[in-house]
Amino acid sequence: MSNLEIVTGAGPVGSAVALQLAEQGINVRLLTRSGSGPEHPLIDRRRVDVSDSEALRSVSEGATAIYHCIHAAYNAADWERELPAAEKVALDAAASIGAVVVFPESLYAYNSDTLMTESDRRNATGGKRGVRTALLRAREASATPTVSVVASDFFGPRVRTAHAGERMVPKVMAGKKIRVIGSADQPHSFTYIPDLAAAMIAAAHNPELWNSVIHAPTGPALTQRKIAEAFARAAGASPAKVGVLPAWVLDAVGKINTDSRELAEMNYQFTKPFVMDSSASEVLLGLSPTPLDQAAEETVVWWRAEQARTAAA
């Protein structure tokens, strides 16, 4: 059996997947336009345009799995223009070499006001949510085996552009006040990115889970205030000072600012409970979520190392 697996993209998800695969002794070919990504003896970083079907097929020859971890700018127009075509290239390449494709997925396509489970309908429409629905349907219709691994908002090493990323963690570490969107005290699920990566790998290696949608192991729902407090504890910082940017403000600014409008589309996730349940998938995967205090500590350790690296540059 081949000992080669492909990862497209070296963002937080792709990097976490590549490192975990390498740590398991698997040869990884990490594909990006720039040849970037984490360093490891078993990670072969390649400059490849993964939107080029022939280039992706050629470099993936002999692989048993493709982890498709690329994305697009955070707006619906770019998602609709770029993501379906990019996923089709990955699916076609995998079909030609007999590989499974594993996708990280969000909760955007879910259309539930209650606890979100693997059995929920994923049929949201409009904007970015509608794009995610269309992508899930295309995967389901493909003859190529796929697994979509759903996570809530990320946090963890290398996570920057997220609600619990650079807008929160380094500020809390420094004892500064943060402002969160919607509400600081509504229950909200947060997924630790190494747990998502572990779930993607486990799913790829278990054919019984192919052609399904599963949930990454995700701990009990927190609130934005509670996760900020966890980072403060891990950093030995003063208690987190948390303010709120009301949803209506983001809505108003979104009328004149594109970036704010794209964020405002997701206000519903932070003005009422937004909670996923991963218990069924945890049984199937044989995995459980990393305890919050451990995950927060590992996140703070990464940020401290990153700050030291930046200061020394």
Model-identified regions with their sequence ranges:
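Conserved Rossmann-fold NAD(P)-dependent oxidoreductase catalytic core, especially the SDR/UDP-sugar
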Residues: 85-131, 147
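Conserved beta-loop-beta element that borders a ligand/cofactor-binding pocket
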Residues: 106, 137-159
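Mid/C-terminal beta-alpha module of Rossmann-like enzyme folds, strongest
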Residues: 2, 11, 200-262, 278, ...
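Substrate-positioning beta->alpha
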Residues: 160-167, 181-205, 211-215
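Short-chain dehydrogenase/reductase
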Residues: 80-84, 121-140, 162-166, 189-190, ...
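NAD(P)H-binding glycine-rich loop region in Rossmannoid oxidoreductase-like domains
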Residues: 36-97
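N-terminal Rossmann NAD(P)H-binding glycine-rich loop of SDR-like oxidoreductase domains
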Residues: 4-24
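SDR active-site strand-loop-helix element
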Residues: 31, 69-70, 101-106, 149-151
